[in-house]
Regions:
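Structural helix-adjacent loops and short alpha-helical linkers that scaffold large soluble proteins
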Residues: 52, 232-236, 316-329, 375-384, ...
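Active-site SXXK
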Residues: 194, 211-237, 260, 311-315, ...
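Active-site helix/loop module of the DD-peptidase/beta-lactamase fold
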Residues: 230-266, 290-293, 319-355, 359
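Active-site Gly/Thr loop motif
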Residues: 340-345, 388-440
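Active-site-proximal alpha-helical segments within enzyme catalytic domains
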Residues: 219-223, 307-315, 355-376, 429-445
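Beta-lactamase-like hydrolase cores
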Residues: 152-193
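Structured C-terminal helix/loop/strand segments within mature extracytoplasmic catalytic/sensor domains
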Residues: 123-125, 129, 420-468
Length: 468
């Protein structure tokens, strides 16, 4: 590692590309991969406070990276850097067929309370400062002396007698053992009846170290829509308020929020692969809204990042830009003590709640606890009555028998049988709720793809340590 003028840290990173994605031309692929690097480096350094070398090793290394692009096409190093004073990162794409070509640099900028935003290709930091939507003023309250779950001060009293603490500690420790080729656990938190009864972190990670939630963010999107339903601003069973679909002749106008929540919009999509949306610096909501209809709404289940993006598009329409910018914190995060959770946006101010949220295991445990308590927090109803039951009801267009793990799907939550449900994100991110046992189990990871972590089995072993 060497230091350049202006406080920039330069890293040379090379990687194989393994994802099978929609076709992009060579310039787009180069730009998307550069955007991936700039965005990850920005969030890891300025949101999570991690060391750049560990980011390169643990997230952008050849063994762990599943980056956007065609297999084997973009193997040349990218030049990346960090400007700590300006709190931004950059990555310079290199065209694979011409070693002398340099693409337009990709910049990601950090803003307090909002995390990092990846800019469109070629956008300068000065231009971004003038064009990026404003961020509401916010600073994280100090929760260190506030009692759990609103804060982080844990009780000193003994654990409930039904918890076998030694056996539970051994089960949690087992999550951090085993071959690295199989899994790489970052953190585990276990709640029982609201109390934090077990917690452990990998070396170099701690209570306040954030990591990307990946698709666990979709369950957070569910909660935000629930808040708006409770306020009477949205109805899941009427056509979604997407401006691009308002033409009476547009068949997409029949798509409801229920269809979007249950991944049954019928829209054309590349499923969980959205390279341009995530790393291209485009208006992700407009891109999602432009998708044509493939099947009649409500007749097909297809997991799609863009169905979730469109939920937030609807939220922005009914709230307006200013209220939308403050909405995740005002409506949910700050109300339940999730002060170390940062939902990020595209450069047009759209929350990317299909994936792009940075959080901690404790904050995710708080989120699971909200659902365990039927949407009530400290006696205050945050989610409307019946919302949790609605969210955990099987989607009619998805058959659990079609999956090897037997998981069903509700409304932005996966269903594990009749009495538990979970959020699930790539590389092993899980927030699992078991209502009949009063248990929440959070596991975060940096697993190689495809992850071989068995969350169902892990939760079962945790439950064995807590007597009924």
């Amino acid at each position: 590692m060497r230091y350049l003028s202006g406080g920039l840290t330069a890293l040379a990173l090379a990687h194989p590309l393994t994802a099978q994605l929609p076709p992009l031309d060579s310039l787009q692929r180069a730009s998307v991969v550069a955007g991936y690097h700039a965005a990850f480096l920005c969030s890891a350094v300025f949101v999570a406070g991690r060391d750049p070398a560990s980011v390169a090793r643990e997230e952008l290394s050849p063994e762990l990276l599943d980056s956007p692009g065609d297999t084997g096409r973009l193997v040349r190093p990218l030049r990346t850097g960090i400007d700590r004073e300006a709190r931004r990162t950059f990555a310079v794409p290199r065209y694979p067929d011409d070693p002398f070509f340099r693409g337009e640099p990709r910049l990601a900028v950090f803003r307090e309370g909002r995390g990092c935003t990846l800019l469109p290709p070629g956008t300068s930091a000065a231009a971004a400062a003038a064009k990026l939507p404003p961020v509401p003023r916010w600073s994280a309250p100090d929760g260190s002396n506030r009692p759990w779950p609103d804060g982080d001060r844990l009780p000193s009293t003994p654990l409930p007698p039904e918890v076998d603490s030694q056996r539970l500690a051994a089960v949690v420790a087992s999550a951090f053992a085993g071959p690295a080729a199989s899994h790489h656990t970052l953190g585990v938190v276990v709640l029982y009846r609201g109390r934090l009864v077990a917690e452990r972190y990998a070396k170099g990670w701690g209570v306040y170290t954030q990591y990307r939630t990946w698709s666990t963010a979709k369950s957070i999107a569910n909660a935000l829509i629930g808040v708006l339903v409770g306020r009477g601003m949205l109805d899941v069973h009427v056509p979604a308020p997407i401006p691009e679909w308002r033409n009476p002749l547009d068949p997409r106008g029949a798509i409801t929020l229920d269809h979007l929540l249950r991944m049954s919009s019928g829209l054309q999509s590349s499923g969980s692969q959205t390279p341009l949306g995530y790393w291209g610096g485009i208006d992700i909501a407009a891109d999602a809204a432009s998708a044509p209809l493939e099947r009649a709404p409500g007749t097909r289940w297809k997991y799609s990042n863009y169905d979730t993006i469109l939920l937030l598009r609807a939220a922005r329409v009914v709230l307006g830009d200013e209220a939308y910018a403050a909405f995740p914190r005002e409506a949910l995060l700050d109300r339940i003590g999730m002060y170390h959770t940062f939902p990020e946006t595209d450069p047009f101010g759209n929350y990317i709640l299909s994936s792009q949220v940075y959080s901690t295991p404790r904050d995710l445990a708080r989120f699971g606890l909200l659902f365990l308590n039927d949407g009530v927090w400290n006696g205050e109803r945050i989610l409307p009555e019946g919302w949790v039951a609605y969210s955990t009801r099987q989607a009619p267009t998805q058959d659990p028998r079609s999956r090897s793990d037997g998981w069903g799907y509700g409304a932005q939550w996966w269903l594990l049988g009749t009495d538990s449900y979970t959020s699930a994100g790539r590389r092993g991110q899980f927030t699992t709720v078991v209502p009949s046992r009063g248990v929440v189990v959070v596991r975060t990871g940096l697993d190689p793809e495809p992850s071989r972590w068995d969350q169902s089995g892990f939760v079962a072993r945790v439950l064995e340590t807590i007597r009924r």
